Amino acid sequence: MASKRVAQIAAHLNFPKGMLSGQVAIITGSGQGIGAETARLFANEGAKVVISDIDAAKAQKVADEINAAGGQALAVPGDMLDDAYLGELVKKTAEFGNGKIHIIVNNAGYTWDGVIHKTTDKQWDTIIALHCTAPFKLVRAAAPYFRVKDGEPRNIVNISSTSGIHGNAGQANYALAKAGVTGLTKTIAKEWGPTFGVRANTVAFGFILTRLTAAKEEGAFVTTPDGEKVALGIPQAQKAAREDGSAAFKDIPLGRPGTATEAASAVLAVVSPLFSYVSGQTLSVTGGRNM
């Protein structure tokens, strides 16, 4: 009996074709950073991945790299704030997946910081629309591919932040948006879990090395739908105060920031069979920060 049990466990942990073999995934904001790393990891585990990003050139580059490495990827660039694009994204993904979609990772987004008394309506509305409304609309558009009973796994991951859990000075808009997606996650889990077996989870990141945590002086920016440029990153003086000297990263028990690959690995774990009984939860990927 013991040997049979060992063989059974080994079979569950051995995925010769990859943990996501046969699955089709949409990953928004996957032209760079955490999203791109998530796409690469998913493809390495056998998934067909759709690269969704507002930057068409970056989306295509990631897709080309995955395909050149033997994976399967399709770039479908567009603006998450455009309802027509969301419909097209779902349509093209279903075609790419032979009528099926198994995974959505709502990762697209950026920060547009400002203290409460100086935050404009435009700053507020844009961040809420991008981080809350757009993920909801994408999930709603993809509902016919998740509300099915075919015995295949379905997963939705909403990306959040410790700003959404603990708040953060200068980020009232972002904090509210990232707190909001956890409510969306739990509602999906409760509505679509019982009948269709859909798992929904939130992954909340701490300090991860991306363009959002680089020095603002490096010049990274995004452009809003009406053409306004929004500078990304942290002012160099503020960044140096936290990261230099003997007190560097003292609020992180592991003593360092995380990499995009480490962040993406957490997303892979959540959608994998290894987390098959986990739903409606928030996984904090912070190096121990905010314990």
Map each language-model feature to its residues.
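Residue(s) in the substrate-gating loop at a strand-loop-helix junction
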Residues: S161
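Short C-terminal tail/terminal secondary-structure segment
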Residues: S3-F15, H166, A266-A269, S279-M291
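Active-site helix of classical SDR
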Residues: V139, A177, T185
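Alpha-helical segment proximal to the catalytic Tyr-Lys
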Residues: P144, K190-P194, S276
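Substrate-binding pocket helix/loop in short-chain dehydrogenase/reductase
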Residues: V115-I116, T120-I128, A248
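Short, small/polar-rich loop/turn modules that mediate ligand/substrate recognition or access, typified
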Residues: P194-R199, V278-G280
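Canonical Rossmann dinucleotide-binding motif of NAD(H)/NADP(H)-dependent dehydrogenases/reductases
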Residues: G18-V50, I188
